Structures are given as structure tokens and as C-alpha cells.
């Protein structure tokens, strides 16, 4: 387009140049740059002008900018001296304002000053400035001796800038287990080829999955910590990998990870996690008219009495507390079964809350709940929750372990636990990802209350790209990726529970009728 238009370009594509900071609000400095492309653009008055796509050396390509010809200088010795002159001025100006260093870094300036020849004097710069120096500001013409000190002080910030650039350019990889890769392929096939949808709300929603994982993680961490020598407590934390830090620290990191997944999922689902065929379903299930929230008739202080008294099936803790509890074979309920027993459908978020209450009630010997819970557990719960029940030491300082499953081995295993560690485990088992009063009754629930493992797994395909736009230190990123890996292994281990084929139904059955709204929390 350049030659045919008759436009004469001063610079050509691929040429190394110096370019002024394009943002007029930033300090006027010159960057090392390269011209990527040239076009004929237009100025504010509509006149044709040459424009150059500039890549700033050492920066991610997302920072490439279009610049007018008057912002670009040839890479000559004379212009290099101008570059150093402007860099010292910018540093001195920032110092004179008294700003904190962390808030006044000048990207690219430190590297310019770092390569300053020692024999080069300020007066040489003054005499050799080209006419283009007239464009710079008139302020701070006299550079004080402090600027030399400032150069040495600011140079040490260059590694931080370099680290930030490396973070922008690094590739983040999350390894997805083969069984979950196949699930992603099947998911795509069901939605796009067979035109089926995941029935919503899911039997096991994302809140429940994440809370279950924290409990699973805490129990495994406690077991592994109990097997280590006691003197591991004296090891310096700074020299320990994330695998070897104390169990309570691991659990805290795990909680932060799942909460971050919840927030990220709620935000990104409508943006990047839905196939086009699912958009209409999303709009319908997130409508405020679609779900009818249940109002609890008693406060948490009276909840024990409420549970011991007759109550509707949906609120009665003696009934199975999750949709997973319905099928006796451990498999998810079929759509036909859901229609036959609509009252049993409820959020596992709510069931987790009730389950914790049942555990607290069971500590009283007068309560009939433990026996009933014991009878119902082994035959009706999916193997994931049976697995947690068998490994879970739910007891307090003043009571003996509750026999959630008829196993003498469990008591023997937990007999060696210290009281402090047992209390930590019990604290995790009663932990909730979100408060009881969230979301408010007058608002539709967020996606993490409605969707399940199928859509959560899709998030891990997008996470590398999302994490690449975030600022993480190498140490924190490594720990986060390790937690993601452990969580994906958890999903893979229980994929039969989390990804039942029966979750995909015809579009007409993909959500419950608005004439009979379902409660999901």
C-alpha cells in the first residue's frame, strides 16, 4: 500500500529505531524498538500520514502500538545520547516529586541508564542534542548531581521489570488427565453433535464439589502429616516445598484455590465457557423467576430443635441430604426418577450445610439421628461421599468418634491423632465455601450453584490463558499449579460420580419448568 499510494515512508518494516513513549500522560522517554508494519493512516484532520506499528524491545507483543512518524527516530549515536538525556531527566523529575519508587518505575529507562558509558559527561550530551530535543519539556533543564545517584538506585529495579516481562511471555501449562480429556471430548460431542444439554441445576453443583475436595484434601494431608516424623515441625518453612509444609498450611492454600476457582467460574462462564447452543439455557436458568429460594423458619441458634421436630421432607435432616443419596446403586438419578420424586431434588450446597448440622446433633446421645444416618449412609451415598465418610474423624474433645460407617479400622487409625490435629480436621469438615445467607433471597443464584463438574472442567482449558494475564511470582504460580493438578486428579478419581452420562438430556428436559420452580439452596 506504501508505494502505490505515492506516500514516502521515512522508515521501513523491520528497521531498528528509537520511539518516544506513545502515551502523552507518561514521561517523555525514548524506547529501543523495531518497526513491525507500515501503513497509510489519517490524522485528526483527515490528512493521510504514514503510521508505524512499533514493537518495544523486551515487551510482550500485546504492548505493540501504532505511532506517527514524528514519534520515531533513527538508531544513531546522536539519538542515543538524546535517549540517555531524557532518561536522566525523567528519573530526576520523579525524584523531585518525592514519589515512592514502586509507584514511579519507568519501564525501559533503567536499561538505558545501565548502559551509560562512564566517560560520557552531561555537557557532551548538551552540546550534541539534535533539534528534536526542542520537543522535550523546558522544565528541569539543569540536571543535578543527584541524578547520578538516582541512576544507581533505580538500576536495581530492572530485575523486577524483567521478571514482569518474563511473566507476560511465559507459557503456563495445566496437565489434564486422560480420562478428563475424554470427558471434554464427550462433552463437546453431546452438546454440539447430539444437541443435548446438561440438566440444570446439577445434582452435584460446583459449590459442593469444591467443598468436598477441601475435606478430601484435608483428610489426606492429615494422614500424610501423621506418618511423618514429629521433628518435621522444626524444619524452616522457607526451605520447604509446598509438598512438605504443615497440613494446616496446605489446607489454607487449598481453600484459597477453590475460592478462586469459584469466583473465576462465576465470572467467566457466560463469557468463554458456554457453547452457543447453551446460551439460551443459561439465560433461562439465571433468571430471577426461575428458582424459588427456600426461607428457613428458624435461626441457626434454634436449628437443632427445628431438626428434631417434624418438618417438610426438604428440610428434614433424616431424609437423604443430597440427590446422590437417592439411587441405591450409587449411580446418579435418571430424569424419570427425578420427575417421580421432585421433592428430593435440592442443592448439595444445602445438603452440606444440613450434613454439618446432623454431625453436630449426633454428638447428643439422646438424638436418634446417628443410627438413622448410619443405616442410610452405606447403601445410598455415591462412592465419593462414602469414601469421605469412612476417612472422616468427626468428633470433639468431649465425645467419642461417631460411627458414620460400621468400621473398627477407622477408630484405630484416628486413635493416634493428636487432639490439635483432630480439631483442625473437624474445623475443615464444618467449613463452608460461602456463607449460609449467600446468595440473598431476592437475587438469582450464581452459576456455581447451578452448574456442575461438566462446566467446571471446561474452565481448566481456559485457565492457562487467564493466569497468563495475572501477576504471579514463580513460587506462587508453582504452588497454585500443584493445587490445580491435585484437584484434577480428584476429579479423575471420582469421574464416574461427577460426570454421569445421564446428566445430558434433550433440550426440552434440560431445566425444570418455571411453573414449578426448584429450590437450589
Swiss-Prot record:
Residues 114-166, 298-380, 390-409 are annotated as: Disordered. Residues 139-149 have a biased composition (Acidic residues). Residues 168-517 form the MRG domain. Residues 290-440 are annotated as: Required for the histone acetyltransferase activity of the MSL complex. The modification Phosphothreonine is found at residue 405. Residues 316-329 have a biased composition (Low complexity). GO terms for molecular function: DNA binding; histone H4K16ac reader activity. The keyword Transcription regulation applies. Keywords: Chromatin regulator, DNA-binding, Nucleus, Phosphoprotein, Transcription, Transcription regulation. The modification Phosphoserine is found at residues 309, 311, 367, 400, 407, 411. PROSITE patterns: MRG. InterPro entries: Chromo-like_dom_sf, Chromo/chromo_shadow_dom, MRG, MRG_C_sf, MRG_dom, MSL3_chromo-like. Component of the MSL histone acetyltransferase complex at least composed of the KAT8/MOF, MSL1/hampin, MSL2 and MSL3. Interacts (via the MRG domain) with MSL1 and KAT8/MOF. This is MSL complex subunit 3. It comes from Pongo abelii. The lineage of its organism: Eukaryota, Metazoa, Chordata, Craniata, Vertebrata.
